[in-house]
Amino acid sequence: MELVGRIETRPVEGARDLDLFVKLPFRLPEQRPNRVPPLLTDEREFHDPKKNPQLTQCDVQRWVAWRDGKVVGRIMGIIQKSYNAAHGERTARFYNLDCVRDADVVHALIGATEQWARSKGMDRMIGPFGFSDKDPQGLQIEGFEHLPVIATPINPDWLPPMVEACG
């Protein structure tokens, strides 16, 4: 658990925390007007090691951010060991970054992931980037007036500058 300002980041531990993590995007206010939420069954399967073998082949850590007793964000850190070995890298990835409109929350979540990555010997972090290039990656930076298409990043327009400010 890490406390940054009023924001507390807690690692996801156990089924109850994972359920909260998976359902969090459905509870967040202030998302983009044309937002189409992911299918809950797809989200559950993505985070189920019985359905997604990447979860057993990578180092993965998830966090939920809290402020004043309320859930305000989530993020997942990934170390894709086989990719790093094949490319001679020590790169971590962040993924599933969803939160309320608050730069402090974004900073706390990315900071927790960065600290975890360093503790695992990583010297670089990229994201949003999932397990592979088959997962939606990156941030949408324009075209928010249009409905999203399948397998593309879906984020509010205020998120990219907040992520960029984290370095």
Language model features with spans:
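Short aromatic-glycine motifs in intrinsically disordered, low-complexity regions
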Residues: M1-E2, A151
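Acyl-donor binding region in acyl/amide transferases
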Residues: A85-G167
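A short helix-loop-beta-strand connector motif used in the catalytic cores of GNAT acetyltransferases and
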Residues: D48-R67, G73
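A short acidic/small-residue loop/turn micro-motif
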Residues: I79-K81
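Short amphipathic alpha-helix that is part of the acyltransferase structural core
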Residues: E2-K50
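A common structural microfeature
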Residues: L18, V60-R62, V72-R74, T91-F94
